[in-house]
C-alpha cells in the first residue's frame, strides 16, 4: 500500500432549496392566500476520523466532494426536504487546514471525532412569509442560499508517542523491529525506509506505546531534501525522541549535528522535544572507540545517553526503562498542570 500523508481537496456544501410562489386553490375559495413553502437546507460536509484508514491515498484520486442540494418548497406551505450531510472518512491523526488562509480548522485524533468543514445553505422563504396587511397576495419568494465551498489541505500526522530519528541507515528500522512486532524493510543502504513505520512496544504491565520510525532525514530535510520534509511533520505529535547515531559512520558527531540542525530549522518546538541519545551498532565498535565516543557526546550534549546494539540487544532493556521513566514523568507533569488549571 502506498503511504500518502498529505492531500488537497475541494468540498462544496449543498445549496438551500428555493422557496416558491403558490396560492391556495380550494373549492369555494377562488382567491386564496399565499401558500408557497420554504426550501430545504442543503447538506453540510463533515469529516469523521476512522481507524479503518491509514493513509490519505483515496484523496489522490477523488478530490471534489459535493453534498446534495435541499429541495425546493411545495404548495400548501410544505417545506422542501433537507439534504443529507456528506460524511467523508479520514484517518485518525488528520489535521485539516484551509488551503487559502492556512488556518487550522481542526485536528482529528480519535476515532469518531467529527469536523464540519462546509455548512449547507439555508432554504429560501416561500411567498407565504411575505403576507402583510398591505400585500395580501405576495408574488415573490427567496432562492436558497449557496452552501459553503472551500479548498482543504489534509495532513496526516502519525499518532506515536516515541519517535526514532537519525540519518538514513542509522538503524531505526532494525531497532523498531526488535522492540516491537513491526516488520519494516531493512537493508544496508540509505533510504531503505521510504514510509514511516509504526510499532507497538509493550511494558511488562501489557500497556502498549506506539513508536514511529521517521525516515529520510538528511541535511536540508526541512527544505524538502531527501524524504524528510514530508515526514518531519510526523514528529510533531511525539512526546519523546530517540536520536540514533551510527557509531560505524565516518563522523558520528557531524551526523548528530545534522539532525539537530534540521529539527531546529523545521521549528514547531521539535528541537525542544525531550530526547534520548542512543549510540547504535556498538557490536561493531572496539571498546576503546566506544569509550572515546561516549566521552565526546557527553561533553557535547546534556541529554541522557545510552549505548545500544539492535543486533545483539545490548542496552535495549536500559533504553526501554529510560523511555518508560520519561513518559511517566511527562504524564505526571501533564496531570499536575491540569490540576493547577482546574484549581
UniProtKB/Swiss-Prot annotation:
GO biological processes: ribosome biogenesis
Keyword vocabulary terms for this entry: Cytoplasm, GTP-binding, Hydrolase, Magnesium, Metal-binding, Nucleotide-binding
Major site of localization recorded for this protein: cytoplasm
EC primary class: hydrolase
Amino acids binding Mg(2+): 173, 193
Cofactor(s) of this protein: Mg(2+)
MF GO annotations: GTP binding; GTPase activity; magnesium ion binding
Keyword GTP-binding: yes
Membrane is among the record's keywords: no
Protein family membership: Belongs to the TRAFAC class OBG-HflX-like GTPase superfamily. OBG GTPase family.
Function: An essential GTPase which binds GTP, GDP and possibly (p)ppGpp with moderate affinity, with high nucleotide exchange rates and a fairly low GTP hydrolysis rate. Plays a role in control of the cell cycle, stress response, ribosome biogenesis and in those bacteria that undergo differentiation, in morphogenesis control.
Subunit structure: Monomer.
Protein's recorded name: GTPase Obg
Taxonomic source organism: Synechococcus elongatus (strain ATCC 33912 / PCC 7942 / FACHB-805)
Organism placement in taxonomy: Bacteria, Bacillati, Cyanobacteriota, Cyanophyceae, Synechococcales
Recorded name of the encoding gene: obg
